[in-house]
Curated annotation (Swiss-Prot):
Organism listed in the record: Conus stercusmuscarum
Stretch forming the signal peptide: 1-16
Full protein name: Alpha-conotoxin-like Sm1.2
Function: Alpha-conotoxins act on postsynaptic membranes, they bind to the nicotinic acetylcholine receptors (nAChR) and thus inhibit them.
Cystine bridges: C45-C51, C46-C56
Length: 57
């Protein structure tokens, strides 16, 4: 009976460890180093279609 208990504890411990496989990004924090899409860029142009001011083509 004790052997079965140890086997269950070991199995749940192994399952609970994070895998070394590549992540799909679901748990990653939002990146802040990318440029803001809804504000004017360094030329003063807004690339967002919903932006009414500072449109540059």
């Amino acid at each position: 009976m004790f052997t079965v208990f140890l086997l269950v504890v070991l199995a749940t411990t192994v399952v609970s460890f994070p895998s070394d496989r590549e992540s799909d990004g679901a748990n990653d924090e939002a990146r802040t180093d990318e440029p803001e899409e809804h504000g004017p860029d360094r030329n003063g142009c807004c690339r967002n279609p919903a932006c009414e001011s500072h449109r540059c083509g």
